[in-house]
UniProtKB/Swiss-Prot annotation:
Disulfide bonds: none
Organism: Saccharomyces cerevisiae (strain ATCC 204508 / S288c)
GO CC terms, sorted: extracellular region
Compartments in which it is found: Secreted
Name of protein: Uncharacterized protein YOR389W
Keyword Transferase: no
Glycosylation sites: 68, 150, 219, 366, 441, 447, 464, 528
Region span, Disordered: 141-174
Length: 624
């Protein structure tokens, strides 16, 4: 009996070991894991989804129409790019952004910031803003027409700078500060479009919406709403709201990209340089400008203008000398401003020191109806109810709780750039053929299908092709939108679904043109004739392609520099708001350089033909 009990126990033990081993193997094979979250694991943890393949990708597409898809697509492509952000100025999205450790940023002002303040990504931006040279001679009588600003990279009030003080010694010294990111600043919100435009036509809606919601959420009843400049009020509220979430600040575009940094503590940035800015007249050892006033014996009328025929010989000599100095300094100041333009233009293709984590994009698109025209839409439209605004801010808070890591995000901008590089030349070439001058004949069909057939045959299956492999239009779409990283968040799926929609429309259009015109080519090749429907088919094909090009709204298809610019020129895209080329107000009928008033939109828009400009153009524009 003892032997039997021992044998039974041994047998049971062996069976238990085998059973445990089998369960372990089963869990390994089928991915059985605990559903409980680890200690302090956030509920917002993202997880991988099943692989998206050619035969199942439709199952993962989110519900988004073509207009919203193009809006998402173009917002992604314009992100952190200066020229596209000005061409498509009304942004409606918040992009999570990271400024890596070691990145240098700049500020020009009279003191070291102790609260939130503006920093520039380019030193030319801060230098141009901060170095405000005194005027000499007759120019000193004029109110200096400087850039409007809110203290961007400095601490000047909004509006034109005041007239120069009567004495050089009374001018407050300006400091040029250089900061270095002490860590990865991984909780920035980049506001797309021309978000530093200082306008009321929609460009600043992302800040206004956030400010309004914050006011109610934090019960900010006495924060100087009526006394403070709008964007300083927005910045103060946003930083106050974001502090519990670790918000580093916001990023906007003006002429170059600027950062509103919420906290200048050593944990975030370190001050690596602080220079007193030297005026050119000081550097050259020239005296301060002569004070031209009645008190100093100068003949001035009631409007403060010189009475030229009452000038003494000494006064004439002073003016002749100082007017000459002013002419020289005007060249210096023009180059200073042009350098800012050049630095900004360098980011037309991207501000690559800032990285975007697209996984946590928060956008007004697809939440309510937003007009697809980025020149004529508003985030704060009637469809954006208070409840929807609260939902957007709630999504921002959830994203900030997680923090951003661009290395874990698919680079959607890169993926979309590839699509445009592939399809823009094809679509434009087909359009040019279909819009050829002269009579419609078989050559149009032959030339157009030479392009479309090469595309379609790539995906055409042989008669004995197995259904095991993808083919046709469906596979064509999949080939171009197949993600190279797993989609993990709602934003990922929304962005990818937008790509599916956009590429689907493009593929459909290419196939439609091919199906319309190939029979005409076949008829001409076999019978040396075309059908009576040739003209109608070409016109249908033309309207299909041209309508698609208009609906896509791709900048490359509509905007181009007039020529290859010379080394001393930049291809200038007008900006909205402060600029060395002057302040451009979207709602004005006064056309600024490179803009025109669009009657249908009732606002200024940027001309499709961009111009090369140099320092002389800047000086001429300033004098008008």
């Amino acid at each position: 009996m003892r032997f039997h009990r021992q044998g039974t126990a041994a047998t049971v033990g062996v069976l238990l070991i085998v059973l445990l081993g089998f369960c372990w193997k089963l869990s390994e094979s089928y991915g059985i894991v605990s559903t409980a979250l680890p200690h302090k694991q956030p509920a917002t943890k993202i997880t991988d989804t099943p692989s998206i393949r050619w035969d199942n990708y439709h199952e993962f597409v989110r519900d988004i129409d073509f207009d919203n898809s193009t809006a998402i697509f173009n917002s992604i492509r314009a992100a952190l790019r200066q020229s596209p952000s000005d061409i498509h100025p009304v942004g409606v999205s918040y992009f999570p952004a990271v400024i890596p450790k070691g990145t240098l940023m700049y500020h020009a002002g009279s003191k070291v910031p102790t609260t939130f303040e503006w920093l520039a990504m380019d030193h030319e931006f801060s230098y141009s803003f901060g170095l405000r040279s005194p005027s000499y001679g007759r120019k000193s009588l004029e109110r200096r027409h400087g850039r409007f600003g809110n203290g961007t990279h400095g601490d000047h009030p909004k509006g034109p700078p005041p007239p120069p003080p009567p004495d050089e010694k009374d001018r407050g010294s300006q400091k040029m500060l250089t900061y270095r990111a002490a860590r990865d600043l991984n909780k920035f919100l980049y506001l797309d479009g021309a978000s530093a435009a200082k306008t009321d036509s929609g460009e600043m809606d992302t800040q206004l919406m956030l400010s309004n919601v914050i006011k109610e959420k934090l019960n900010l009843t006495d924060d100087g709403e009526n006394e403070r400049m709008a964007e300083r009020l927005y910045a103060a509220r946003i930083c106050k709201w974001g502090k519990p979430f670790g918000l580093d600040g916001i990023i906007r575009v003006e002429v170059g990209f600027e950062v509103v940094l919420c906290d200048f503590s050593a944990d975030n940035v370190e001050l690596v340089s602080m220079l007193e800015m030297v005026q050119p007249n000081q550097y050259l050892g020239l005296p301060a400008p002569t004070v031209i006033s009645k008190e100093e014996g100068w003949p001035l009328d009631e409007n403060g203008n010189l009475v030229e025929d009452q000038l003494t010989d000494d006064q004439k000599a002073i003016l002749e000398r100082e007017d000459g100095w002013e002419k020289t300094f005007s060249n210096f100041n023009a180059v200073k401003s042009f350098n800012q333009l050049r630095a900004g233009t360098a980011h037309d293709n991207g501000e690559h020191r800032i990285h975007i984590d697209y996984r946590y994009l928060v956008s007004g698109i697809n939440r309510t109806y937003i007009a697809p025209d980025p020149n004529n839409r508003r985030l704060l439209d009637e469809g954006m109810t208070w409840e929807k605004q609260l939902d957007m801010v709630d999504d921002l808070e959830k994203a900030l709780e997680v923090g951003f890591d661009a290395t874990q995000s698919m680079d959607w901008q890169l993926a979309f750039d590839e699509l445009v590089l592939k399809f823009a030349p094809l679509l434009k070439s087909v359009s040019n053929i279909l819009n050829s001058n002269g009579d419609i004949n078989e050559s149009i069909a032959i030339n157009a299908t030479a392009l479309t057939l090469n595309f379609c045959l790539r995906f055409e299956p042989a008669s004995n092709n197995s259904d095991e492999f993808g083919s046709g239009k469906d596979f064509a779409v999949y080939q171009y939108v197949s993600p190279y990283q797993a989609l993990k968040t709602d934003a990922d799926f929304l962005i990818w679904s937008s790509a599916v929609s956009v590429v689907g429309e493009i593929v459909d259009a290419i196939y439609k043109v091919n199906d319309l015109l190939i029979p005409e080519v076949y008829s001409f090749m076999t019978d040396n004739t075309t059908s009576s429907d040739l003209i109608k088919n070409v016109e249908t094909a033309r309207s299909t392609i041209d309508g698609l090009i208009e609906s896509l709204g791709w900048i490359e298809l509509n905007y181009r520099c007039e020529r290859q610019c010379n080394w001393d020129e930049v291809c200038y895209t007008p900006s909205w708001g402060p600029s060395p080329m002057g302040m451009t107000e979207p709602g004005s009928h006064n056309e600024g350089f490179g803009t025109h008033f669009d009657e249908s939109r009732q606002r200024l828009v940027i001309n499709s033909k961009l111009q090369c400009i140099n320092i002389n153009d800047l000086m001429v524009n300033r004098n008008h």
